[in-house]
Amino acid sequence: MATARPSIVGPDSGPESPFPYKMEGKVISGFGRGSKELGIPTANLPVDATISPWISSISSGVYYGWASLQLPPSHPESPSSSSCSPYVVFPMVMSIGYNPFYNNTERSAEVHILHKFTADFYDAPMRLLILGFIRDEKNYDSLEALVKDINTDCDVARTSLDRKAWVPQGGLLHPAVDVREKQGDLDGSWLVRPNDSPSA
């Protein structure tokens, strides 16, 4: 009998060391399976240890946190012209690893943003503030079992992020993000910082 998975991960007090991790780049096309086979579209980033040196040493598995996107003005989810930042912030869950069910030979970073987009955003700049770990990477006997676990990952990420210590300060979230508290205690300023500002 399968062991029941926890519905929430991480302490109420907020992310613990070594988190958060930061990752950024332009959204690239992946294997084309997220939407077609799984019904769970992904926005992928290149795995580049020269940009994200920590990625070589962390476990392959499922992580969660916040993603910010710099969408073109023509995109339906693009921020209004009155917004102080070109970035919009959404909750996300992501896989870092080889996806053994598909026998991948290269490590990938596949991000599922927890929002239903009405248009693609390939090549858009994306930043990730990775706050915690959900589970190890594993193989599956069937596609159905894989999809079930991914959907559970999404639920765990939503619930885990919907706490005051995990929600960014300053009302940074896109208006469509459904959380109880729109303003939390987490420093998420890097997610929306202009490109010409110094990094933290």
Swiss-Prot record:
Listed EC numbers: 2.7.1.26
Record keywords: ATP-binding, Flavoprotein, FMN, Kinase, Magnesium, Metal-binding, Nucleotide-binding, Transferase, Zinc
GO terms classed as biological process: FMN biosynthetic process; riboflavin biosynthetic process
A GO CC annotation given for this chain: mitochondrion
A Pfam cross-reference name: Flavokinase
Cofactor(s) the protein needs: Zn(2+); Mg(2+)
SMART domains found in the cross-reference section: Flavokinase (SM00904)
Reactions catalysed: riboflavin + ATP = FMN + ADP + H(+)
Residues engaged in binding Mg(2+): T42, N44
Domain of life per record: Eukaryota
Pathway participation: Cofactor biosynthesis; FMN biosynthesis; FMN from riboflavin (ATP route): step 1/1
Matches recorded under InterPro entries: Riboflavin_kinase (IPR023468), Riboflavin_kinase_bac/euk (IPR015865), Riboflavin_kinase_dom_sf (IPR023465)
GO molecular function, one term: metal ion binding
Chain segments carrying region Disordered: 1-20
Active site: E110 (nucleophile)
Textual note on the cofactor: Zinc or magnesium.
Family: Belongs to the flavokinase family.
PANTHER family for this protein: RIBOFLAVIN KINASE, RIBOFLAVIN KINASE/FMN ADENYLYLTRANSFERASE
Protein function: Catalyzes the phosphorylation of riboflavin (vitamin B2) to form flavin mononucleotide (FMN) coenzyme.
The protein, known as: Riboflavin kinase
Organism classification: Eukaryota, Fungi, Dikarya, Ascomycota, Pezizomycotina
